[in-house]
């Protein structure tokens, strides 16, 4: 099936919210999770440097990656916040393409690094990031801060 990759629009918000809940359920192994607070996703549609990238198949959003530009401190970096691919679509290279797009976006903004957090026990995600060249910058309780120089 063909996958279209693009920047999200406000019309994608419901699908992004659903994928976020699916991601939380996978990470925390429970159905009892809360989604984004009201207004959170809308901040990505204001025309600033923060964006959400989406993957779409047959008109449905099947993956997303939210990007936040951080220019305070040195070095400036792109932070990958939330990242989810629908369970039925995993293994198709969607995650790799979204990461590739994030790198392209960081370079276009002149940001030399990418940072993200991952849960220590999310071994699948940790393997994905390791294959993509991320290393551990800091251990922060149940999470690891990972980084990659571009």
Residue ranges and their predicted role:
Residues 96, 120-138, 144-145:
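Conserved active-site alpha-helix within GNAT-family acetyltransferase domains
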Residues 3, 7-81, 86, 99-101, ...:
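Acetyl-CoA-dependent GNAT
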Residues 74, 92, 123:
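Loop/helix-junction capping segments adjacent to catalytic residues or to phosphate/diphosphate-binding pockets
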Residues 85, 91-104, 127, 131:
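Conserved acetyl-CoA-binding loop-helix of GNAT-fold acetyltransferases
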Residues 106-117:
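Conserved GNAT acetyl-CoA-binding A-motif
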Residues 147-150:
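Short beta-strand-to-coil "C-cap" segments at the C-terminal boundary of structured domains/repeats
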